[in-house]
Amino acid sequence: MKIGFDNDKYLKMQSEHIRERIGQFGNKLYLEFGGKLFDDYHASRVLPGFEPDSKLRMLMQLSDQAEIVIVISANDIDKNKVRGDLGITYDEDVLRLMDEFTSRGLYVGSVFITQYSGQESADLFKKRLEKLGIRVYKLYLIPGYPSNTSFIVSDEGYGKNDYIETTRPLVVITAPGPGSGKMATCLSQLYHEYKRGVKAGYAKFETFPIWNLPLKHPVNLAYEAATADLNDVNMIDPFHLEAYGKTTVNYNRDVEVFPVVQAMFEKIMGSCPYKSPTDMGVNMAGNCIVDDEVCQEASRQEIIRRYYKSMNALVSGSGTENEVRKIELLLQQAHAEITDRKVVPAALEKEKATNGPAAAMELPDGKIVCGKTSDLLGASAALLLNALKELAGIDHELHVISPDAIHPIQQLKTKYLGSRNPRLHIDEILIALSMSAATSDAARLALEQIPNLRGCQAHTSVMLSDVDVISFRKLGVELTCEAKAEKKKEYQKV
């Protein structure tokens, strides 16, 4: 992989900048962490060299000063909202985040339930956390939020919210996903702190858009593609341009809400410490790009992947035409085409040649391998075996799993487990491969190559079953699929 981002420089520069911001506010700073605090795979894809846990590692350098508050919306609890990248609900992710933070030596002070209006599911979640010894606080729905600043910044507004008791100079506000109420949490806390005579401050840590890259830079366009469902739009920060005469990039929600935030700061603090949304940020990522062309190309590839994801969502009923059209426009702005993703034409050509669903994968050395549908294997399972053989230097004509070993598994699926699809999925072929590895050197060599699949690109000529999608995700393979089902059915399950 070509490197475009200096991760070590980023860790050092980012932690130093946050320390400076803490010092500007009398040693008490509420830091809103946008995006993912760890598992930031989007950043690692568009900034090659950025580690998915970079922000967490940076925070660990501040561990003696920091405590974490995890925010979750009562509405998201009520709707059982799911993290698309992990396939778990937001409330389960709160517990996962707590485990991850504490296992790294970071202090999690409490959980804050926002947008609370008596939801029974939120009450049950609160009780569940309290039984685990976790402190839980609530932020209530405020009428007229966010425009009625006089009411919001009063004892009847923020004053009704619980006050989170914190003990450290840096309070990191994070959440399972966007729209959880992180900024509202920070402002509510500032209100309570000033009531108590503590002159705390607020800052925002948002990796994207990168404020000191051009508006239409592919890295920033890739962020728009990633948030197409939220209808976020990158724009020039007009407040920063007016205050300093300098062009910087922010996104529409922060720009639109800034006059309101500014008014709230003035009511809470007496004056607003910031002249623009850009001023509120502490992100140093743009200063750590060491090869701009590498990051541009990685971002163009990300937009293509997001396009396929939006098309799949549209076909399955969970996406919208607007989302697809927006990403099509972003592809044009980034001067990218779907055929720039090498595995796309390879998979489609294989489908045409075999007259059945097919798949292709680009290996770390750039070589493309393909898989086709057969009586024994689905295209994805065949692709996986072919990729492992290629990585291990095994002749493609050699069976690493005997067909005689596959037939009993097919019989188990169809005769005893009620499946109508006899072909093996990825997880099933991996189990068969691991069993064969006990007696076959070739199978063992193939199995040992599994870690080398991480980061590989794959494309299939049809949409896959959930079981194969999840398997690719677990293997770390970046998957895209054509937006069509293998067979036209009202109810798709294989």
Regions found by a protein language model. Give the residues of each.
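Flexible phosphate-sensing "switch/lid" loops adjacent to ATP/NTP-binding sites
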Residues: 1-173, 189-350, 356, 363-365, ...
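The conserved Walker
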Residues: 177-178
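Hydrophobic positions on the alpha1 helix immediately C-terminal to the Walker A/P-loop
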Residues: 185
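A short, polar/charged loop-to-alpha-helix boundary motif
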Residues: 376-392
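Flexible, solvent-exposed loop/hinge segments and secondary-structure transition points
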Residues: 392-393, 414
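Active-site pocket-lining segment
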Residues: 399-419
